[in-house]
Curated annotation (Swiss-Prot):
Cellular compartment(s): Cytoplasm
Name of encoding gene: aspS
Protein name: Aspartate--tRNA ligase
Family: Belongs to the class-II aminoacyl-tRNA synthetase family. Type 1 subfamily.
Major place of residence: cytoplasm
Enzyme class: ligase
Protein's organism: Staphylococcus carnosus (strain TM300)
GO molecular function term, any single one: aspartate-tRNA ligase activity
Amino acid sequence: MSKRTTYCGLVTEDLLGQRVTLKGWVHNRRDLGGLIFVDLRDREGYVQIVFNPDFSKEALEIAESIRSEYVIEVEGTVTKRDPETVNPKIKTGNVEVQVDHINIINKAQTPPFSINDENQQVDENIRLKYRYLDLRRQELAQTIKMRHQITRSVREFLDRDGFFDIETPVLTKSTPEGARDYLVPSRVHEGQFYALPQSPQLFKQLLMISGFDKYYQIVKCFRDEDLRADRQPEFTQVDVEMSFVDQEDVMEMGEALLKKVVKDVKGIDLTEQFPRMTYAEAMSRYGSDKPDTRFEMELKDVSELGRTMDFKVFKDTVEKGGEVKALAAKGAADKYTRKDMDALTEFVNIYGAKGLAWVKVVEDGFSGPIARFFEDKDVEKVKELTGAETGDLVMFVADKPSVVAQSLGALRVKLAHELGLIDNNKLNFLWVTDWPLLEYDEDEKRYVAAHHPFTSPKDEDLDKLDSAPEKAQAKAYDIVLNGYELGGGSIRIHNADIQSKMFEVLGFTKEQAQEQFGFLLDAFKYGAPPHGGIALGLDRFVMLLAGRNNLRDTIAFPKTASAVSLMTQAPSEVSDKQLEELSLRIRH
């Protein structure tokens, strides 16, 4: 077997007249009666190779037997294509290789779907079952290549900035906070379990206490939770931690890192500072803590209508301490029928809204089922507050603030997609700051950490941990890209007393805190530096930069929405002997 001299996708006019040895897969084969043309593919793309009896009758005879996805090696001379056969869509489109030697390395069965037809609609379950074939398709292969380019850019930045790449344990301890853990039974310690890490959070903090100053890791994390398009049971994050820093330092580093990656991978120079918005402002204006700012259509508070209008729904809501907010969709009045509005009402019901009131703006006022409740002054007030004009559709939700935000925030995004308001070429980054430290869980009747229990309260809010925990704000910050949470970070607690107080507010007894996190509390007593960091979702970042619709297209071997590998059939049953060794028994 000869040595390959170059990749198929790199054969260009620079190699004209030279002999090359290529190895790859038969992407396409065309027999023109006396001449056979083959597109030979490898990871860099494909090049046209020609079997011509004038160059080699023997090679032509062998080529007559090859089919799609055969693995072959060829030797030949790079020549210029005839002008009428030039393909300007590919890098190799000006040249072809006249083959004088071919060796069939391996034959292939007919694949269950076409590799060379990117437009063919293939059931995703079939693609996942034959993922090794799916990865041969150029679009998916390019996404995996982009993933490599992103991680390389990340490493270059962090290495240059003095960060140490340090691995942390995969078999660790289960903790009660956060999502459900994946558990690993211990054979040696009967009845005890390791947990796969949801994050290296505690270990990276311990590395700061150890004195390493700057840490990073591109790390696999695991969460046993319900899946959706932008979630996987195992996912990868760019994990970063720094000592002797404040919030501004971490955000500045994170922003510079993201700008470098976008420049390296997309060739886009993001020169402006990323905009910033408080959590309260994001919820008020967009109904979301991760707003998509590629389009306008903001939520507008029209609660004063509940005090001036004779409309019971608005009036009762405001009297009970709720609010009324409106969403004005530009030029949408004629695009939505009564049936469409019923469907939108059902949509907001999902988010807890009891209904969706709406009007269409016409020349002489409003039309629609609640138009009669609006006097002229009310019409003008709505126009003033929302910026609505003739031809617009205005929708209202009246409820408690959390329901209004969730329902209208989701409706805003849905309408933007339906009305084509989103520019998919935009990359709109946004920092969301000033997060609440805690949230109250109505089901468990206790406070839970908005981010995690190790996030530091703002200095001025330390006293509120005793008096009004729900009002305390965190030294926390999220980075949002095009309506997705790309990453989150915070300045951490580095004082044992404050950390113990935080555990107390979260409902831990001293004994529980010591049992679960005693090693961290002890470490704080030996001189812990102030520290903070950020974790960026790599899978999601690749998805957004590559313009894909779900995370599965960014991962070489992903799981389905039900956390199954269709290719390997994981998870699977294990033998009774294995269970016995682990002192486990399956209950059916």
